[in-house]
Amino acid sequence: MARITVEDCLEQIPNRFQLVLAATYRARMLSQGHAPKIESRNKPAVTALREIAAGKVGLEMLKKVPG
């Protein structure tokens, strides 16, 4: 499987800071047992970035963070 790059993810979420926040939150969800939206055998952080690059997860992750 090809490596995931930040540039792949920036096509979906252009702001690097929002990208980091969304990926972090999604990786935490995956590590707590949520089902991945893509098929992946990688660690939660890589799976989260792959989901973002594929357009399966986006900035809506930031709206789910309790405030």
Curated annotation (Swiss-Prot):
**Signal sequence extent:** none
Alphabetized UniProt keyword annotations: DNA-directed RNA polymerase, Nucleotidyltransferase, Transcription, Transferase
**Gene Ontology cellular-component terms listed:** DNA-directed RNA polymerase complex
Give the SUPFAM superfamilies listed for this entry: RPB6/omega subunit-like (SSF63562)
Q: SMART domains attached here? A: RNA_pol_Rpb6 (SM01409)
Q: Looking at the keywords, is Cytoplasm present?
A: no
Q: Supply one GO BP term.
A: DNA-templated transcription
Enzymatic reactions: RNA(n) + a ribonucleoside 5'-triphosphate = RNA(n+1) + diphosphate
Q: Which InterPro entries match?
A: DNA-dir_RNA_pol_omega (IPR003716), Pol_omega/Rpo6/RPB6 (IPR006110), RPB6/omega-like_sf (IPR036161)
**EC number per UniProt:** 2.7.7.6
Functional note? Promotes RNA polymerase assembly. Latches the N- and C-terminal regions of the beta' subunit thereby facilitating its interaction with the beta and alpha subunits.
Subunit details: The RNAP catalytic core consists of 2 alpha, 1 beta, 1 beta' and 1 omega subunit. When a sigma factor is associated with the core the holoenzyme is formed, which can initiate transcription.
Do you know which PANTHER family this protein is assigned to? DNA-DIRECTED RNA POLYMERASE SUBUNIT OMEGA
Q: What is this protein called?
A: DNA-directed RNA polymerase subunit omega
